[in-house]
Amino acid sequence: MVENVIYPAYLDASLSRSEGRRVAQSAAVEAPTVDEIAKAVQQVGYDAVIERDKRYSREFETRGRVLVNNADDATKNDIVQAVAAYVGILRD
């Protein structure tokens, strides 16, 4: 069983790539929350577990993280790109 971790910093439009953003600026959103990310993960078709007390190592503030379970058929990059697209759709 593979667990992938998605931090809000991966999708944050206010961060640079060197600060932790993993998607293109056009796909990123401003200040994503773990709730939005978890909802998008479920829309993509994977199980999501929210851990609110975790912190991304490059950030000072604790924003939490989302564990993506049962994602054996996709790479982490594929999952992050799909989740970014769905978070953008949820915001519209």
Swiss-Prot record:
Q: What is this protein called?
A: Signal recognition particle 19 kDa protein
What subcellular locations does the record give?
Cytoplasm
Gene Ontology, cellular component aspect: signal recognition particle
Under the subunit heading, UniProt states: Part of the signal recognition particle protein translocation system, which is composed of SRP and FtsY. Archaeal SRP consists of a 7S RNA molecule of 300 nucleotides and two protein subunits: SRP54 and SRP19.
Encoded by which gene? srp19
Please name the taxonomic classification of the source: Archaea, Methanobacteriati, Methanobacteriota, Stenosarchaea group, Halobacteria
Task: Report the source organism.
Answer: Haloferax volcanii (strain ATCC 29605 / DSM 3757 / JCM 8879 / NBRC 14742 / NCIMB 2012 / VKM B-1768 / DS2) (Halobacterium volcanii)
In terms of InterPro entries, this protein maps to:
Signal_recog_particle_SRP19 (IPR002778), SRP19 (IPR053394), SRP19-like_sf (IPR036521), SRP19_arc-type (IPR022938)
The GO annotation for biological process reads: SRP-dependent cotranslational protein targeting to membrane, signal sequence recognition
Superkingdom: Archaea
